[in-house]
């Protein structure tokens, strides 16, 4: 199995300017700006990129991009396309979420190369016409008092009464 990941971050403002450097920091390098995490610049695409090897495909890893210029403090950015976001302000109230990394700043992204397969319980389920869906974007933490799936499921009648035909779960 492949144990490598390619990270890419677009970094160009409305004036065409970008940061002078970008490092990837995460669980695997103790959230430190190290040479092996220095990302390459592709000026034509406006992106920073790096390919890293040696990840355990079954393990989840957390990371951030650390951008900066010669003067001033670094900016810490999560990946805008991540499926999982860890939040230092709210996650401390969720018992099953791992402790927020002490050296990280702001929001933290996560990835896992080999995600566990979901075992569907209803094999005969049919999705309605995708052009006729009424989608409700739901974040458990903000939707119910208990901030979990049980609290959300207890309010499915409310969602159905709104005319919603599909629920999109937002990242945790």
Give residue spans per PLM region.
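Non-catalytic, glycine-rich low-complexity segments
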Residues: 1-17, 97-103, 125
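Hydrophobic core residues within well-ordered beta-strands of beta-rich domains
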Residues: 3-5, 61, 134
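Aromatic-rich carbohydrate-binding modules that target alpha-glucans
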Residues: 4-58, 68-90
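Extracellular/periplasmic catalytic domains that process cell-envelope and extracellular macromolecules
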Residues: 17, 56-57, 127-131, 160-161
